[in-house]
Amino acid sequence: MSEMITVGDAIARTLEQYHVEAIYGVISIHNLPIADAVGQRGNIRFVPARGEAGSVTMADAHGRFSGLGVALTSTGAGAGNAVGALVEAMNACTPLLHLTGQVEKAWLDADTGFIHETRDQLTFLKASSKRAYRISNANQAIAILQDRKSVV
């Protein structure tokens, strides 16, 4: 029987394979599965930021000097707060991975004002990044992260 892993675990394990040393971010209810998996594994340092733009700016600097920079932001308005810094990193061709959560599937794209929901988050992330994906399971997370074009 194959091992069942969460999306958060899949992300943490794959980032370790890329020798990611640090994730810069803001913790929120919708990205806790990723943050928890990273914390439980203990191989990647979490560097807290005061805001999402700051987390992406720190990841941008890390990417420019040391390889892949990784930012973890809140969903919805939090991810929106990261947009300016994402555009800067994209224009500089910085190797950067921005991770954010999403609202529960029952509320996804419902446009009801559910906590941290924003209308069509994926579209504004596509406009401010080289690529953006909505991940729905661990296998999809692994496949996207292992495709080098998705990560840099």
Where is each model-derived feature located?
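N-terminal alpha/beta PP-like core and its mobile active-site loop of ThDP/TPP-dependent enzymes
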Residues: M1-V152
